[in-house]
Structures are given as structure tokens and as C-alpha cells.
């Protein structure tokens, strides 16, 4: 499942100074994962990108370890519990523990809203725990910063996709920033 989600990124090439996204993958299909620490190596081809997968205590995740994965009904019924993109026909599918879990409050959206109102006092403070990072993008920091500056100044642009459900599929290259 993690490798499937990591295919959202294009494979990084040595002349690139930004990361690009695969325009054939809708951005709402990208999932980040909590409860584990990991690296996503964009220099590797899809299917071989998740590296250094560890539990929060630092112990390596083993092939025999099991996970409890919570997801909304859309992700469960379109990817997690069907033979298609993640699991091939004939492979064992994950065991469904519960479906359409609803309390007195309602579904996942309502449960999250109730949690924010009652436990967090109506406000949540964003917090990044840095349990994952992108690696394999071995650009020179100065080249990357120059690309960021040129993008902010409007001197360079990432391609605009006709479809608002995708992110830019083009990376900025060293040749492009060398023109400035």
C-alpha cells in the first residue's frame, strides 16, 4: 500500500532541482502514513521506494509484522480491499476488521468534527512530526534554492495541468536555471 502511494511522485533525474508528480495519479490518491517512520526514495522506480521502514521506537519493521490500517470507505473499497492496483488477482487481501464504523455521532467526518469540538476545544494546532521524508533527490542545495527563487519571481513556471485533480508533472532542471 505504501509503495502504491509512493508512485504519486515521478522518478527523480540527476539534472532536476525540484520534485515532479505523476500527472496520471490524482493527488487525492496520495496517502502519507502515521505510526511508522520511513523514507521515500524518489530516485528509485515505483514499487521500490519505501526505505528504512521502522516503528516509532526505532525497531525495523519486519515482513512478518502486521498492521491495523484505518481508512475511509472510498480508499477501502477502491484500493485496499480489491484486487486491482495494490493487490493482484489471486493475492490475499487484507482482513476487514470493521466496515462503516459509525457511532452515535456518525461517520469519519462527523467523528473528526466531534473530536475537534469536544477534545480540542474547537481548534486544532497543526503539528508536523517528521516521521517520513523524501530522499534520493541529490540536487545541489544552491541550485534548488535558485529554482525556488525563480519560481517565486515568476521567471520560471511549472506546467499548468488542464485537470485540477493533478499536480505539476514537470521538474525544473539545471539547464533551465542556468539561463538566469
Mark where each language-model region is.
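Catalytic centers of hydrolytic enzymes
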Residues: 1-173
Amino acid at each position: 500500500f505504501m509503495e502504491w502511494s509512493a508512485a504519486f511522485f515521478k522518478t527523480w533525474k540527476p539534472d532536476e532541482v525540484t520534485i515532479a508528480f505523476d500527472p496520471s495519479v490524482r493527488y487525492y490518491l496520495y496517502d502519507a502514513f502515521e505510526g511508522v517512520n520511513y523514507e521515500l526514495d524518489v530516485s528509485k522506480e515505483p514499487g521500490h521506494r519505501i526505505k528504512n521502514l521502522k516503528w516509532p521506537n526505532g525497531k525495523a519493521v519486519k515482513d512478518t509484522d502486521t498492521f491495523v490500517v484505518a481508512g475511509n470507505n472510498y480508499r477501502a473499497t477502491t484500493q485496499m480491499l480489491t484486487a486491482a492496483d495494490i493487490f493482484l488477482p489471486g493475492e490475499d487481501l487484507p482482513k476487514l476488521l470493521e466496515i462503516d464504523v459509525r457511532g452515535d455521532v456518525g461517520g469519519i467526518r462527523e467523528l473528526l468534527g466531534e473530536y475537534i469540538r469536544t477534545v480540542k476545544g474547537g481548534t486544532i494546532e497543526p503539528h508536523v512530526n517528521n516521521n517520513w521524508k523524501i530522499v534520493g533527490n541529490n540536487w545541489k542545495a544552491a541550485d534548488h534554492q535558485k529554482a525556488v527563487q525563480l519560481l517565486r519571481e515568476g521567471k520560471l513556471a511549472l506546467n499548468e495541468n488542464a485537470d485540477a485533480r493533478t499536480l505539476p508533472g514537470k521538474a525544473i532542471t539545471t539547464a533551465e536555471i542556468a539561463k538566469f
